[in-house]
Swiss-Prot record:
One of its GO terms (molecular function) is tRNA binding. This is Threonylcarbamoyl-AMP synthase. It comes from Aeromonas hydrophila subsp. hydrophila (strain ATCC 7966 / DSM 30187 / BCRC 13018 / CCUG 14551 / JCM 1027 / KCTC 2358 / NCIMB 9240 / NCTC 8049). Residues 2-186 form the YrdC-like domain. The gene is tsaC. Its main location: cytoplasm.
Length: 186
């Protein structure tokens, strides 16, 4: 019988959208390389593609196919790396081949290396980062427990990975890697 990670990875490989615990809230995730999965996630969230999305990864290496580290100075990269793994999301220059279904209207991409052990294990088992957005409809309170994921939302998910959110009170802070400007405070 498959374990919970195997079921979650199988759902991701079938272009499904899953829910999983992150540092502060439950997230919705999917395969960032699957346009159909990303559009399914956006439809569930009722979120416009133009806003762009966040990728969450087990380590920086998992993000290198999506972000252009050559556009950062060594000081900028050091600042980013010093905050990871952790609840810090950075806006980084996207590679020219990073799809618009991830970047939205931008030439940048929001990325995070998670400190949440279950998410790290999930990204490692899947072999790449996940699209990550809060498990709620746009404008509603995010889910902090499996029980908080509404029936409407749950019915549209391929799998809900049981787990506990980390100790963060708020979703991750978002900063611009080049300027250090805070886009969303924690």
């Amino acid at each position: 019988m498959p374990n919970e990670f195997e079921l979650a990875v199988a759902a991701l490989q079938r272009d499904g959208v899953i829910a999983y615990a992150t540092e502060a809230v439950f997230g919705l995730g999917c395969d960032p390389d699957s346009e159909s999965a990303v559009h399914r996630l956006l439809a569930i969230k009722q979120r416009p593609v133009e806003k762009g999305l966040i990728l969450i990864a087990a380590d920086l290496a998992q993000l290198q196919d999506y972000i252009d580290l050559d556009q950062l100075t060594s000081e900028q990269l050091a600042r980013v790396e010093a905050s990871w793994p952790g609840p810090f999301t950075w806006i980084m220059p996207a590679r020219s081949n990073t799809p618009a279904w991830l970047t939205g209207q931008f030439t940048t991409l929001a990325v995070r290396v998670t400190a949440h052990p279950q998410v790290q294990a999930l990204c490692r088992a899947f072999g790449k980062p996940l699209v990550s957005t809060s498990a709620n409809l746009t404008g509603e309170e995010p889910a902090r427990r499996v029980a908080d994921i509404g029936e409407l939302l749950a019915s549209q998910l391929a799998y809900i990975l049981p787990g506990e959110v980390g100790g963060q009170a708020n979703p991750s802070e978002i900063k611009d890697a080049r300027t250090g400007a805070i886009i969303r405070p924690s």
